[in-house]
């Protein structure tokens, strides 16, 4: 490799977290927890490979936040109870002992729940709008999504509170260094952001600033729960798992509103995920979403994710204004991606069988590491 990859290898401070490099593992749903939401020894081995491989930061797969409506997939881990949170502690301690920091992603499925042991076959969402697309079979889903029921004001207050209590457990009991709110990919907070899935006329719906109220209230609850010193971030995307090509209808003006509002709400970082993060955000030309985030939220840390397993693309996104690069497919194929980069070793191509027929963590995957 003839590229100067040293910018990816420089340390970075995320609030009070000192990261050894600019490389993070992106959150990836692996449905390998116990049926009651406890992380497993297999998950611990899976995550430890990334620490041993040199990643400075690991952002875990989304954990559901309550024993009500938030669970998204069968065998998804939870942060809804003290038992679930405490079961994360050996994993986070092992990562930290290896010099890798860890952030817990917190998730509410909303209308895109494919399995919920607490409310079987039922979903809630901003409005009773049938979700586009079909459930994902590699997460044990089949057929159309259920038509959700519109969430009540009281239930929305519970959602916000549960994000806060889950964040407190993640830091206080599970031992994570920070928390990330899942506001991307078509899940609940993204459903509030999106005009065609949010038809409400109360404080949670209407024009774009009102549709952002759910994210703002959640950020404020999480910040209050973890305090001023703990890093709090939010993941944001245009595309959704059930609506891959979706773009923000308001274009760059909407991006200004979204990024400015999230910054004002008190997050420390925005984690942007796009299929190809270097591409123009809107149309065939123009700035990438990372460039827009840097323009409209200049004081925040920006994490870029999306097709950045090629080092030249990762470097391009640093030049666009990203501070950290989060790898998904690249990390799955090469849990030692940072070590290989440093030593100039070839990277393995992504093997799609890792995520099929079910996207759980496989023994062959761990053996190959």
Regions found by a protein language model. Name each.
Residues 1-369:
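Flavin-dependent oxidoreductase catalytic cores
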């Amino acid at each position: 490799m003839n590229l100067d990859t040293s910018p990816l290898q420089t340390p970075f401070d995320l609030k009070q977290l000192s990261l050894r490099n600019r490389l993070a593992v992106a959150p990836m749903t692996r449905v390998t927890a116990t049926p009651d939401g406890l992380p497993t020894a297999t998950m611990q081995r899976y995550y430890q490979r990334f620490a041993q491989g040199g990643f400075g930061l690991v952002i875990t797969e989304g954990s559901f936040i309550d024993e009500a409506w938030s669970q998204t997939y069968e065998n998804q881990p939870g942060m809804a109870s003290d038992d679930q949170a405490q079961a994360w502690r050996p994993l986070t301690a092992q990562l930290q002992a290896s010099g890798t920091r860890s952030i817990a992603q917190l998730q509410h499925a909303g209308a895109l729940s494919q399995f919920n042991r607490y409310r079987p076959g039922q979903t809630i969402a901003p409005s009773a709008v049938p979700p586009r697309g079909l459930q994902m079979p590699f997460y044990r889903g089949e057929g159309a999504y259920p038509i959700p029921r519109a969430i009540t004001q009281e239930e929305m207050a519970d959602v916000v509170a549960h994000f806060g209590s889950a964040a407190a457990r993640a830091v206080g009991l599970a031992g994570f260094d920070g928390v990330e709110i899942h506001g991307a990919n078509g899940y609940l907070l993204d459903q509030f952001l999106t005009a065609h899935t949010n038809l409400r006329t109360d404080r949670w719906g209407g024009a774009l600033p009102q549709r952002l109220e759910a994210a703002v209230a959640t950020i404020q609850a999480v910040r209050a729960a973890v305090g001023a010193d703990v890093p709090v971030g939010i993941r944001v995307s245009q595309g959704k798992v059930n609506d891959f090509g979706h773009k923000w209808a308001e274009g760059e003006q909407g991006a200004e509103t979204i990024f400015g509002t999230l910054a004002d709400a008190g997050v420390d970082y925005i984690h942007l995920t796009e299929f190809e993060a270097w591409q123009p955000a809107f149309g065939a030309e123009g700035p990438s979403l990372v460039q827009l985030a840097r323009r409209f939220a200049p004081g925040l840390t920006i994490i870029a994710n999306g097709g950045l397993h090629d080092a030249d693309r990762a470097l391009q996104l640093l030049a666009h204004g990203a501070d950290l690069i989060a790898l998904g497919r690249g990390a799955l194929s090469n849990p030692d991606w940072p070590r290989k980069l440093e030593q100039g070793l070839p990277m393995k191509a992504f093997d799609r069988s890792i995520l099929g027929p079910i996207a759980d963590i496989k023994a062959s995957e761990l053996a190959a590491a």
